Amino acid sequence: MDIRPPRPNAAREKTPEPPIKPVLLENMPVLSTSKRRKTLTLTLAGLAVVLLGATTSTALWYSWAIGAPSDEERQVRVVVEPGDTATGIAETLHEHDLIRSKLAFNVYTQLTGTRSKLQAGGYVLSPNQDVSSIVDHMVSGETDEIDLTIPPGLTLDELRKSFFADGFSEAEIDQAFSASYDHPLLASRPAGADLEGYIYPETYRMNANQTLGELLERSFDEFYRVLEEKKYLEEYQKRGLSIHQAVTLASIVQKEVTNPTDQKQVAQVFLKRLNDGMMLGSDVTFIYAAEQMGAEATPGLDSPYNTRKVSGLPPGPIANMNPSALEAVAFPAGGDYLYFVAGDGPDAGKTFFARTEAEHEANITAHCRTLCN
């Protein structure tokens, strides 16, 4: 008889686990040396293709970016001040569409060693020049002259855009337009009035490093010289007109018609209306007012410039004008017309005058079939 006590939890003894078979390295699939070389070669080849493509794309972009922006031959004035950096010069050139890329300009000047050789001065450049040509010009330091044309019939806002296109900065334009000028031409101008109408249209030759303020002073000189030499001042005074009043009326004549003969007859109409105490009734005045106000151009517009509603002359000129408009106010045509209308359609470019309102309405019906309806 077995008197040994039974083994406790014998039923719960763990069943021994099978031994773990080690995985031998030699049992794993191994690439052959030739296959490994082939994979590495393909990887390197792919990387080379990517790098070559990127390099080619960069080279193509750079070649394009340092090229001429366009075929335009317009002249643009650029002034480089002492102390200006290549980065700042690139900003100015790009602002005036003279280079395609500021980055490419900076890279070019770095690669060519010209970055610190750009000279201060006034330059006349064109959009049809490439970066190489521009940089060579600026390294030479030769100051240019520019023929700058101020067109007639432009408002001050339009002249601002024209001067910017010529290469003057916004800051320089603001300074020139807001400066105080001591000139006899401006003596009768009301206090606080701007330069609307007083920038004389002409072509001026100037050094590219001259300021816009200096150019405006030359335009005032030219304007006043014309008034004196042509005896316009004397005629204005005979009619009881100050320079400011005469220039204001001439600007309206300029915007109404451009034909010198018609300008003289239009001036006769306006002068007679003023003498008779009638409103000028000029559409171009309320159109100007609407543009300044950002409003719809209607005859009922509430503005001191609207001569459809306000008697007498508006507060000031509405544009600059040709010498022919100044002459028209000084020496108007004879006659006693009170009305005129510009023709359209087959009568485009012609102006029709009338003494009575009935005649005027008949002219409108016969000659202004589209614009007047």
Segment roles from a protein language model:
Residues M1-P22:
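N-terminal targeting leaders characterized by basic, low-complexity, disordered sequences
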Residues P19-S34, K38, F105-L118, S219-E222, ...:
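Solvent-exposed, charged interface segments at domain starts and junctions
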Residues N27-E73:
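N-terminal type II signal-anchor transmembrane helix
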Residues L44-V50, E91-H94, R115-Q119, S169-Q175, ...:
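A generic short-segment signal for beta-strand/edge and adjacent turn/coil regions
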Residues L51-T55, I89, I252:
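Hydrophobic core
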Residues T55, P82, A319:
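Short, conserved glycine- and acidic-residue-centered signature motifs
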Residues W61-L227:
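Signal peptide-directed extracytoplasmic domains
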Residues A165, S169, D182-N373:
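Bacterial extracytoplasmic/cell-wall-associated proteins, especially those involved in peptidoglycan
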